[in-house]
Every structure is written in C-alpha cells, then in structure tokens.
Amino acid sequence: MRPVRIIGAQGSHAGSINSTFHCTDVKVNGAWVRESEDDSGIILRYWDGHWRVQRRQDIEADPTMSMARLAAPDARPPLLLKKASEWQVYCHKDKTWIFKH
C-alpha cells in the first residue's frame, strides 16, 4: 500500500500531523494502520469506516477515548484536514463527541 500524505492541519500538532504516513503491519477493522514518518507518536487509524489522525499515547492511555480528527472515508493522498478547533475527543463507550479547543 502506498504512503499517505496529510496536508492542511493547523494548531500545536500541525508539525507532526502534516507528514507522510506509511503502512504498518497492524490492522484495525480490516484496514492497515499508518504511522507518521516524521513523528512515530502520530498514527492514521481506521475506525468506524473512517480514517482518523490520533496520538498513540492517548490510545495507549485510554483506548476508549482518544484525540481524533475525522480525516476522510478513504485514505487517498492527499488528505486535507480542517482547522485545529475542529479536533475532537471521541468516546467509544457511548459513541459521543466532546469538543475540545
């Protein structure tokens, strides 16, 4: 699978999010997880039919709640993220979104 390039992210994590993600040997819901080549702490992860950019440390700390940004229904480069204020915390337990700025 080819690498995916993410562009257009803003905010404090933009430097690590705007990078190239390469495929790993990990699968989530039948889709490959992609890790950032610039920052191994950021991954592009498939969940509920969508790709999300997430911080690995958040997932490891609490798998039910993690920093997530809906990227696209299909990870075809380039993915364009919107402004940082649209980043959200998604709680998998009750399928709700909590907005964080």
Regions flagged by a language model, labelled:
Residues 1-101:
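Interface elements of modular peptide-recognition networks comprising either
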